Amino acid sequence: MVVIRLARGGAKKNPYYRLMVADQRKSTNGRFIEQVGFYNPTARGQEEPLRLDMARIEHWVGQGAQLSPRVAKLVKDASK
């Protein structure tokens, strides 16, 4: 099954997440199909905290991809 989930990056105590479309059987930071956005929970000032490619997310959900709980919350908050 294909899932859209977060892959952690960044430094110690300074997380940065990429929203990845990947096969559920692959590791979280392993092989992926496509990157559809990013989430920076520690964004300050002019930094962009969240960017989502909603067209690609809708495409993958239409193809049967599942959203992880955290990604579903981010998508819901971004679409307000």
Curated annotation (Swiss-Prot):
Q: Which UniProt keywords apply?
A: Ribonucleoprotein, Ribosomal protein
Any single Gene Ontology cellular-component annotation: small ribosomal subunit
Name the SUPFAM superfamilies on file.
Ribosomal protein S16 (SSF54565)
Q: Does the keyword Secreted apply?
A: no
Name the domain of life this protein comes from. Answer: Bacteria
Bilayer-crossing regions:
none
Name of the protein in its database record: Small ribosomal subunit protein bS16
Name of the coding gene = rpsP
